[in-house]
Amino acid sequence: MKKLFIIGGTMGIGKSTVSQILKQKLPNSVFLDGDWCWDSSPFQVTTETKEMVMKNICAVLNNFLTCSAYENVIFCWVMHEQCIIDKIISCLNTANSRMIAVSLICSEQELTQRLQKDVRAGIRTSDVIERSVQRIPLYQKLNTIKVDTSGKSAAEVAEEIAAL
């Protein structure tokens, strides 16, 4: 039976890093970051682009799920509302798959420190800090397994998720 890991969390919490480590750790794994499905310049969030990104995500994930080469499908994206997770799941062919939905969480202080490091490195702009911190409480409301990343390395978090 395949495993489908759906990994959500606010911006800067470590979804992509953890997912990349998980991909290397688990056998026959493939990884999709939802951000890759609408990586554009300028980045535009409209009704049309939101519909497009969902179609792109579902198409790629379904291709991974039906490909016999893969045992572990790893998907990460911000997914701060249950309706986003539900919409993605509803369009997937999950027969013969076990779905593991995870939300990465951490303290406000730790998230701020991580994001400030990214801002200093030029990876993110400073406005992301406030937006990301404001979303932290939204993840507690989701029907997902919560994995607290506070004080843990990305490898430790990946190990915890792999054990689920």
Model-derived segments and their meaning:
Residues M1-L4, A69-E71:
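Pre-Walker A (Motif I) flank of P-loop NTPase domains
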Residues I7:
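Hydrophobic anchor at the beta1->P-loop junction of P-loop NTPases
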Residues T10:
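P-loop (Walker A) phosphate-binding loop of NTP-binding proteins
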Residues A95-L115, V147:
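Conserved phosphate-donor/acceptor-positioning beta-strand/loop module used by diverse small-molecule
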Residues K117-E160:
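Small-molecule kinase domains that catalyze NTP-dependent phosphoryl transfer to phosphate-bearing small molecules
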